[in-house]
Amino acid sequence: MDDWKPSPLIKPFGARKKRSWYLTWKYKLTNQRALRRFCQTGAVLFLLVTVIVNIKLILDTRRAISEASEDLEPEQDYDEALGRLEPPRRIGSGPRRVLDVEVYSSRSKVYVAVDGTTVLEDEAQEQGRGIHVIVLNQATGHVMAKRVFDTYSPHEDEAMVLFLNMVAPGRVLICTVKDEGSFHLKDTAKALLRSLGSQAGPALGWRDTWAFVGRKGGPVLGEKHSKSPALSSWGDPVLLKTDVPLSSAEEAECHWADTELNRRRRRFCSKVEGYGSVCSCKDPTPIEFSPDPLPDNKVLNVPVAVIAGNRPNYLYRMLRSLLSAQGVSPQMITVFIDGYYEEPMDVVALFGLRGIQHTPISIKNARVSQHYKASLTATFNLFPEAKFAVVLEEDLDIAVDFFSFLSQSIHLLEEDDSLYCISAWNDQGYEHTAEDPALLYRVETMPGLGWVLRKSLYKEELEPKWPTPEKLWDWDMWMRMPEQRRGRECIIPDVSRSYHFGIVGLNMNGYFHEAYFKKHKFNTVPGVQLRNVDSLKKDAYEVEVHRLLSEAEVLDHSKNPCEDSFLPDTEGHTYVAFIRMEKDDDFTTWTQLAKCLRIWDLDVRGNHRGLWRLFRKKNHFLVVGVPASPYSMKKPPSITPIFLESPPKEEGGPGAAEQT
């Protein structure tokens, strides 16, 4: 090994140097940046290609739509039809003077668009049946009114005629039918449609579809109609497209004197339609009233709560009658609106009244119940010194002597703990069963429909246990329950001081109103002096009832009480009849008697300890339930109480009217 020498061809061995960490990081970072730039460049190129392709596709599609739009058939499906619609056309760069209007009518859906904006779309099941009407301002194109009239049901055509007659000339009218709109479309309504220039409207048949656009008092701007081929089917959907030329602002406005009242009127009339002469340019109806003051007005400082929803035309009618009543105090009136609806608040502002809106709670009848609770609580918070509150609803006419009636009777609530309320409504007070506007009764039921509530009753008893939102109860039925009423009674007049005119509501329709509300008697005589008011106190009333029964002539019980001859053809007499009533809740005979007397018969109302009081042929007619009533002692021994048996229930009988 001593003679070993390294080879000159091999490099000497040395330790390998490690690369710097900085150079390694810089190398990797350079590679990542290059990759990112590459990806970004690719993405930009991809987007450019996509944009070019889409532009070409849009141009080709518009060309195809333009060629096909003239051939659009009314029977096409709604979605297909909308897919082929042109976008709203624009004329130049200045203000537009033409509206693009599209109207769709079919069995299950209606639709209206103005310049591409949907102003009506209704496809809810079992709702919105009938003729939908929209009113546009002829100068601006904004929606001034939206209504639906269920002209399948009775009297809705009358409401439509009234509304259309209230619309000012020149306004743009749009009509469209959902489901069925002809069944109760009578000649008067058809004649009105004919006067508007419609050709198809007056000939509208069973389950036809129809769309119409025109000016009131001006030309028809478009109309389409499809007849139903058979009773079991509907007309094809129709889709109407038309241009509506706009008028000048000068033509659409009135030039009233610049007063505070007219400024309110101008704000109202520029926004909404369907209120008739209140917006007349030449002779507008007053919006301020000056009824005579009421001498010794006991209700001058009693707050009035008007319970309202989204029925502005009802509210308008109701407030006009309320503000015209003798003794009214406008500063004591508050309108409570269930929901943030604009038009009802416009009506309130028109009359210069206080309006309060709140968020709806719950659904259906529970929503109404919560609305009442919130409104009553707010009323006593607004007027903490008030002992009472008057409760009204938006669909009531108020008699001219409404406050006079309350002023003469409200002391009874303070002096008689056996009383529950004072109501302006007589459930049994029909045109043929009510006669004396000066006469008062005590009844065990709570009629509502214009009534006075004692604050102590509400705060101490009703408010703490008011039905909660999850309970779908009617507030008035709950108040009538024995647990709330606790044997107390209400004071009512023989002739009502309120009239229920509303035919659209949660528990109301045309059939129901026709049968039970339309023919109620309503006092129109001012200044009625109530008779023997203090005799309505608990003990005094018993004396009065016994006096009446002692003087009454007993009718011939062998006759049929449902026949007109049951009562003699006299006037001014008092008669009594005795009917079978085995116990306090046995109302079999009374219910059948109420049916043949054509008065309220759905449940028992208007009674006092088994006694009913009404008028027949201008005679005071008393009915006593035997033996349940304590007044049975007045029955002569020879008289057998009348018994009317309930008819057998029919199995499979017709139910309530449903969507056609």
From Swiss-Prot:
| CDD domains xrefs | GT13_GLCNAC-TI, PANDER_GnT-1_2_like
| Subcellular location as annotated | Golgi apparatus membrane
Q: Which GO terms describe its molecular function?
A: acetylglucosaminyltransferase activity; beta-1,3-galactosyl-O-glycosyl-glycoprotein beta-1,3-N-acetylglucosaminyltransferase activity; carbohydrate binding; manganese ion binding
Sequence positions bearing Phosphoserine:
7
Where does it mainly reside?
Golgi
Show the stretches that span the lipid bilayer: 38-58
Alphabetic keyword roster? Disulfide bond, Glycosyltransferase, Golgi apparatus, Lectin, Manganese, Membrane, Metal-binding, Phosphoprotein, Signal-anchor, Transferase, Transmembrane, Transmembrane helix
Please list the cofactors this protein needs: Mn(2+)
List, alphabetically, the SUPFAM superfamilies matched. Answer: Nucleotide-diphospho-sugar transferases (SSF53448)
State the Gene Ontology BP annotations. Answer: O-glycan processing; protein O-linked glycosylation
* Cytoplasmic topological intervals: 1-37
Q: Which residues form the GG-type lectin domain?
A: 97-258
Q: Which PANTHER family match?
A: PROTEIN O-LINKED-MANNOSE BETA-1,2-N-ACETYLGLUCOSAMINYLTRANSFERASE 1 (PTHR46396:SF1)
What is its biological role?
Participates in O-mannosyl glycosylation by catalyzing the addition of N-acetylglucosamine to O-linked mannose on glycoproteins. Catalyzes the synthesis of the GlcNAc(beta1-2)Man(alpha1-)O-Ser/Thr moiety on alpha-dystroglycan and other O-mannosylated proteins, providing the necessary basis for the addition of further carbohydrate moieties. Is specific for alpha linked terminal mannose.
Q: Which named protein is this?
A: Protein O-linked-mannose beta-1,2-N-acetylglucosaminyltransferase 1
